[in-house]
Amino acid sequence: MIASEVVHDGMIWDVVRDTVDLGEAGVVRREYVRHPGAVSVIALDDDDRVLLLRQYRHPAGAELWEPPAGLLDVPGEPLQGAAARELAEEADLVAGAWWVLADYLSTPGGSDEALRVFLARDLTQVPVADRHVRDGEERDIVVRWVPLEEAVEAVLAGRLRNPSTVVGVLAAAACKARGWRGLRSVDAPGDRVAGPGDGGGA
């Protein structure tokens, strides 16, 4: 890295311009979105139905079906803690069992956003008196429980397009086909650059 500057200071994320020496490839400039990261939750009930929320997403100009999800915007909060918070706030649910389903980079050519997708099971309702009051885009959230196989078909047909939905649903289906073997613990390390043969997160 030769130089780095913030060219746009946003409410949630910034746009950064880096000057990087790539050796024989030369010196290049790259602008990208610097993102705090996020988590999402594939919550499955005892009948292997996945919880999806319909929520308006302004950049897409549409309401999208997606799992509970949110930014890593609480300093020092563990990833699983952030996921549990989002599950409670957006879906009024608490999970008794957690695993890591997948790690992915949403747009590695234009953003450093890294996301972790959790699997949550053994679900119970948050008591009414303790429920989060939703407002803004979350105020009119619609909740639907969808059989996992039906969700897979919707992904493959292009009806489910949110990236965490696509990654999470397909990962859950793959894990189910393997008898749920190989799920990672909630404190498994996540590495933004490890490859398939490196034993780290993808």
What are these regions (language model features)?
Residues T19-E24, T107-V128:
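Active-site-adjacent beta-strand/loop module that shapes the phosphate/pyrophosphate-binding cleft
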Residues H35, S40-R85, P127, R134-E137, ...:
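Conserved Nudix-box catalytic region and its N-terminal flanking loop in Nudix hydrolases
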